[in-house]
Amino acid sequence: METVASTQVQTLIVRRFGLVSYEPVWRAMQDFTQQRDAETTDEVWLLQHEPVFTQGQAGDAEHVLFPGDIPVVQVDRGGQVTYHGPGQLMVYLLLDLRRLKMGARDLVTMIENTLVDTLAGYGIEAHARKDAPGVYVGDAKIASLGLRIRRGSSFHGLALNVDMDLEPFLRINPCGYQGLRMTQIKEFVPDVSWASVADAWLSQFVRAAGFQSVVEQRGLPGDE
């Protein structure tokens, strides 16, 4: 007989948003994680953000060089400062790691592998680095990771540069690394579409995490 727990681990809810501001989504992630219990179905949120710099818990103000007209938001994820903006694939991973039988390091490795495999599908040879989380093409960073684990559940996630204005990265030391060069899929695949990359990554993730079914829902949790 199938139990509630086994049903939850087999199903993933996916929510897709348009271009949205950062703080309402961040607060919704916090609320979802605080309220979830052992029977809460895992979720993945796919979206783009209006321009914003986010400063992680380990963030040092000296890495924010000249933000100009782009707001800087102090947040509760790991890592240093990064930039989010239109044309970047944001993925928020709201997962019960205990149910998935994963530790934080396992999750990071899985995310990096799904990104490398997604990029390979576009003919881009990418790799992870042991000394600096994220995914790189040569010495240029194409995807960033920043997670928080609370009561065995993850939130925040990853940012993959697809087709965006990279100039704002020059206003910071990305992820705390002075002079770190950023790149994006468009530099290798000029006609790339954000939606196709989102679908390609999602397929890799569903397979890697072992979900058996995907349910698409609209709006933030509680808005249905």
From Swiss-Prot:
Q: Which reaction does it catalyse?
A: octanoyl-[ACP] + L-lysyl-[protein] = N(6)-octanoyl-L-lysyl-[protein] + holo-[ACP] + H(+)
| Keywords of this entry | Acyltransferase, Cytoplasm, Transferase
Any one Gene Ontology BP term: protein modification process
Q: Tell me the first and last residues of the signal peptide.
A: none
| Domain of life, per lineage | Bacteria
Q: Name one Pfam family in it.
A: LplA-B_cat
Which residues of this protein are annotated with the site description Lowers pKa of active site Cys? 141
Q: In which pathway does it act?
A: Protein modification; protein lipoylation via endogenous pathway; protein N(6)-(lipoyl)lysine from octanoyl-[acyl-carrier-protein]: step 1/2
Q: Where is the BPL/LPL catalytic domain?
A: 38-213
The UniProt function text for this chain reads: Catalyzes the transfer of endogenously produced octanoic acid from octanoyl-acyl-carrier-protein onto the lipoyl domains of lipoate-dependent enzymes. Lipoyl-ACP can also act as a substrate although octanoyl-ACP is likely to be the physiological substrate.
The protein depicted here goes by the name Octanoyltransferase
The organism's lineage? Answer: Bacteria, Pseudomonadati, Pseudomonadota, Gammaproteobacteria, Oceanospirillales
